[in-house]
Design a protein with these regions (language model features):
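Hydrophobic alpha-helical segments of polytopic membrane proteins
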Residues: 1-45
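Juxtamembrane transmembrane-helix termini
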Residues: 3, 7, 26, 49, ...
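Hydrophobic membrane-targeting alpha-helices
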Residues: 4, 18, 43-45, 136-143, ...
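Membrane-interface catalytic loops of GT-C/OST-like multi-pass glycosylation enzymes that act
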Residues: 4-8, 108-112, 176-186
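Hydrophobic transmembrane alpha-helices and their immediate junctions
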Residues: 17, 121-166, 188-192, 197
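Transmembrane alpha-helices of multi-pass inner-membrane enzymes
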Residues: 35-36, 135, 165-219
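Long extracytoplasmic/lumenal interhelical loops at the membrane interface
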Residues: 57-121, 142-157, 162
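Membrane-interfacial, low-structure loops and terminal tails that flank and connect transmembrane helices
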Residues: 142-157, 204-224
Length: 225
């Protein structure tokens, strides 16, 4: 991640680190290990990496960031003028469309999954996209709840937990990257469906067994009249 020089990737990595703090039971150990890994890694990176990352705090004077702001403006204007479905895949960054709103400016990718979808598929497309993300978080929470504390479903619980962290990284890092259709995000969403079905089936079977045991105990020890 650090070797990619991507500010969006760094944001995603920071989101994963923060999520880990709230998930782990051994926070002090986790923080100590995080520091042991992060400090040498940052010292190992060249000056060009630090200069690029420092541009996050100097966004107002960074030409690359200004290009993103221009792209966000174009995405909004395109969604407004081509309501409700936008102009299609990669439309807003086409020179002819981009310069129609910002004459003379260099066309620029949105570098944000949210503005990318807004410009390409309009307000309705963005709404559907956000609902999909929200549904993925809700589903992962349901899977974790159904599988928590059940030894034979531990793998389902762990997978749902990691998918949830993956979604957090995608949503945070994606705010600075044009990766709206990233295949790992699609795979995360797709995997949650069978995981939920498996967790529901296992939970229902466990409940059925408990009910059968309770009924048998009542039959063996009838309540006196």
């Amino acid at each position: 991640v650090s070797g990619s020089y991507s500010r969006g990737a760094l944001l995603g990595l920071a989101a994963i680190a923060m999520a880990g703090i709230f998930r782990t039971r051994h926070r002090f150990v986790y923080l100590a290990l995080l520091a042991l890994l992060a400090i040498p890694a940052l010292n190992f990176m060249p000056d060009s990496f630090h200069e690029r990352m420092q541009s996050i705090s100097n966004a107002g004077t960074d030409a690359s960031f200004q290009g993103r702001v221009d792209a966000w403006q174009v995405a909004f204007y395109v969604a407004r003028d081509h309501f409700p479905l936008g102009v299609g895949f990669y439309g807003p960054q086409l020179k002819e469309i981009f310069n129609a709103y910002l004459p003379g400016a260099t066309s620029h990718a949105a570098h944000s999954i949210y503005f990318q979808v807004l410009g390409e598929h309009g307000f309705i497309g963005l709404a559907i996209y956000l609902v999909l993300i929200a549904a993925a978080f809700i589903t992962s929470a349901q899977v974790r709840k159904l599988s928590r504390g059940i030894p034979e479903l531990e793998w389902i619980f762990q997978m749902a937990s990691m998918i949830q962290i993956s979604l957090i990284a995608f949503c945070v890092g994606g705010a600075a990257l044009s990766l709206a259709y990233y295949d790992v995000f699609i795979l995360d969403v797709a995997l949650l469906i069978p995981l939920l079905n498996l967790a529901r089936a296992a939970a229902a079977a466990k409940k059925k067994v408990k009910r059968a045991i309770a009924d048998r105990q009542i039959g063996e020890n009838p309540i006196p009249a």
